[in-house]
Amino acid sequence: MVDFKSIIAKVATGATLTRDEATDAFDAMMSGDATPSQMGALLMGLRVRGETVDEITGAVTTMRAKMLPVTAPPDAVDIVGTGGDGSGSVNVSTCASFVVAGCGVTVAKHGNRALSSKSGAADVLAALGVKIDITPEQVGRCVNEAGIGFMFAPTHHPAMKNVGPTRVELATRTIFNLLGPLSNPAGVKRQMIGVFSRQWVQPLAQVLKNLGSEAVWVVHGSDGLDEITLSGTTAVAELKNGEITSFEISPEDAGLPRAPADALKGGDAQANAVALRAVLEGMPGPYRDVALLNAAATLVVAGKARDLKEGVALGTQSIDSGAAEARLKKLIAVSAAA
């Protein structure tokens, strides 16, 4: 068993942990073998110094080893944001997930209830009528029959109960805010991940490369959004063919108009559910455009579109044909029957 005191002592000097040390330390925390004080000390020590790629890789390795998995096709994708961007925006990645699923790409979405906003992925899906507290086997059925499934993080990461109270007491961002999107229970190898700070764009792409992902976009909007934004440029780190490339994109690259950040302000889960359903029913406007933009990037990651403009064309067809809305209705039905 890891000597947790020596781990804390090492971090206290400003030294970094090896990948194996991080794996062992997080195993101790998630197994209930570390006290709340020890966990708080380590989490804040890492936060103040800044977590390294090796430390995040080790922590994710433990998260993945302890999660309850879901069976999904090898070409399934996930669209997810870390949350915590403080924007209070509408549920962009959730809406984009249905657009992508309507294009025939299987989506295995991993998410939770809101952290800093009024409505996280789980909140808005529940408001839409999707049953979220179902077993991993039932989620697998949704993925296979509806082409989209939602994995509610607390169900799939039961070991997190050992660190939950400490996280609540700390009441500030820790490494765990980064780990969720990296710990998809379906083991997807293709992801579009939004992060709350530009500093994490490149490192998280490197972590996913370390862990064997095939195709990834990690993004952060210039307005602070943990999605691809309409209001300005978006920083991207792309993992493709084993190489990481960094670049910036704008709405114009996808043939979409810009819109101010406040045009995407959301409300509570019920209000956001109404707005999401309106997009899937064909309502034009900034919410539709940002959903198309993020769906387009995901279709590029999935290998379904060559570029953002083709992705937007496919996404537009998904919405206007009713295919995206049909995926939502099918998910509601299959999850209810679970």
Swiss-Prot record:
InterPro entries: Anthranilate_Pribosyl_Tfrase, Glycosyl_Trfase_fam3, Glycosyl_Trfase_fam3_N_dom, Glycosyl_Trfase_fam3_N_dom_sf, Nuc_phospho_transferase. GO terms for molecular function: anthranilate phosphoribosyltransferase activity; magnesium ion binding. Binds 2 magnesium ions per monomer. Gene3D superfamilies: Nucleoside phosphorylase/phosphoribosyltransferase catalytic domain, Transferase, Pyrimidine Nucleoside Phosphorylase, Chain C. The keyword Zinc does not apply. The keyword Amino-acid biosynthesis applies. 5-phospho-alpha-D-ribose 1-diphosphate binds at residues 81, 84-85, 89, 91-94, 109-117, 121. GO terms for cellular component: cytosol. It catalyses: N-(5-phospho-beta-D-ribosyl)anthranilate + diphosphate = 5-phospho-alpha-D-ribose 1-diphosphate + anthranilate. Anthranilate 1 binds at residues 81, 112. Keywords: Amino-acid biosynthesis, Aromatic amino acid biosynthesis, Glycosyltransferase, Magnesium, Metal-binding, Transferase, Tryptophan biosynthesis. Pathway: Amino-acid biosynthesis; L-tryptophan biosynthesis; L-tryptophan from chorismate: step 2/5. Catalyzes the transfer of the phosphoribosyl group of 5-phosphorylribose-1-pyrophosphate (PRPP) to anthranilate to yield N-(5'-phosphoribosyl)-anthranilate (PRA). HAMAP family: TrpD (MF_00211). This is Anthranilate phosphoribosyltransferase. The gene is trpD.
